[in-house]
């Protein structure tokens, strides 16, 4: 019996339903297959999708679902076992993948639900970042304004310009209606309206500094909002205004300038502040923002620094101007002093010349009178005249020396000399006076004292003569000792003087001790003051001028030394000590100025022909008298031309007066040299001058004169000069 596997439709609508199922499964399969393709496409387009492996599972699930619907198309009709097997396999796989996907969704769905939370978080974070960016932009804008304002403020160091610039730039930057600066008064008890933005010349309006609103602002470094009706904020008209703009105030520190006194600057014994008031426009809803207040605070600090710099510069410029004025005054005073010194020197030079000419006559004639037969009374008068004249000549020399020491024109004349001989010569000059006063003098020379040294022999001798002479002058009894030694580093000396000997130099120490009148210790500093007279010394009664020690001190200073006096009091004697710097000489014999013969009185001048040229008739007569008394045959002339005409080889010596200014009298020496080409035929040329300055001696040497003789000249001086001429030696008397 044949079995039929065909399913016969039980009713006609079944076929229609089958067709609908067939079509539905087809479209379901198409949809299932298209969904993974769409997912794959969009996932590839997105680089941030985090669940790719989940998408693979979900895609497999959809594909398998679509496959079951597609396979199901073949099950609506009679189908083979293979189709049933495929259908079963597809459904099993679909079930497995569906379960796996369902299990995976348990973990995925919470993450998907948290996406909204993350979205809200990101939105909040973005809003916060926007706020921070706005703050950064605000700070950057504030910083830019601060830099701009600081540059404008620092572009000048004028105090008024700084303040006006600050107000203008703040008003422009912050769009202010008004801006003002209140400065403390000199007393610091009030604030005065000094600068405003809208008014070029504000009314001098003051408010007490103790107002509560001012104390509130001065109590903090921050900008403070104050009432628009505050006394310091009433700077704008209020008529027609419905709403006054907000007002802030900030303090401006006035830095303490301890080393300066600034005009119009308050006394800063306590910390003081200025007050800056800033006003927003009226009838507006604008308010102060935090960054604007910070800008105001920073600008206030910058203004404080700029004001301090300006104040310092202002005072420095004032000090500079004052210093320039003082320099001008000092320069004028210096020029006046130099003019006065030149006038004094010119006066002294003229007086020296004018006084030495009559002094020459007095001393020369007095010395001639001494050689004649005189009664004791006459001889005493002549000796008194001669002694007084010599004292006057010494005083003139001292005044000239002091003048040249003070203006710095006197320089040391260095040369090699015998130091031991110098001390013996000083004693030979002083002993006659000491013998009369019955004062024994002893000389102690240290064994290590160099014999030949380099220094200014004349000035050193002058110092020693002054000090030893004072010891003899002010001692009525006792003894005098003169000690010379080489100063050692450990020798006692004043605290401000240090001896530093070297291999080529040493310091000579001379100590002159006497048992005379002594000195009051309070009077010792006065001894080195020119023209000073101490009652303990009774200088005037002793015939002194008060110049000796003052000149000696200056000479010692020129020799890089020091001088001081020690005494225990009146009646106990005193000790004068000085150190001078000398150079050590390697010469075995002195090459300095030759000395006159020991006994010039024994030289015979009879028949010695001498020519005297002097424009002054009295001086010419006196010089002739001295020479005639010595036995010379004298010819006198009164002019250079006459001298040049008369001079001949028979004349052994020509005395020429060169006291007149100019070089005419020096030129005659050159013409005499030209006239006598052979030296042994030319007479020796000796200058007669009353000028003691070094330039006269140098000029005489440069014009070929053989010697210089200073007026006034005594008979002994003339005898010594002529004896030296006969020895054929060039003589330049120490000047």
UniProtKB/Swiss-Prot annotation:
Binds 1 copper ion per dimer. This is Ethylene receptor 1. The chain crosses the membrane at residues 23-43, 54-74, 92-112. It catalyses: ATP + protein L-histidine = ADP + protein N-phospho-L-histidine. The gene is ETR1. May act early in the ethylene signal transduction pathway, possibly as an ethylene receptor, or as a regulator of the pathway. Residues 350-586 form the Histidine kinase domain. There is a cross-link at residue 711 (Glycyl lysine isopeptide (Lys-Gly) (interchain with G-Cter in ubiquitin)). Its EC number is 2.7.13.3. Belongs to the ethylene receptor family. Residues 158-307 form the GAF domain. SMART domains: GAF (SM00065), HATPase_c (SM00387), HisKA (SM00388), REC (SM00448). Its main location: endoplasmic reticulum. Residues 609-726 form the Response regulatory domain. It is found in: Endoplasmic reticulum membrane. Gene3D superfamilies: 1.10.287.130, 3.30.450.40, 3.40.50.2300, Histidine kinase-like ATPase, C-terminal domain.
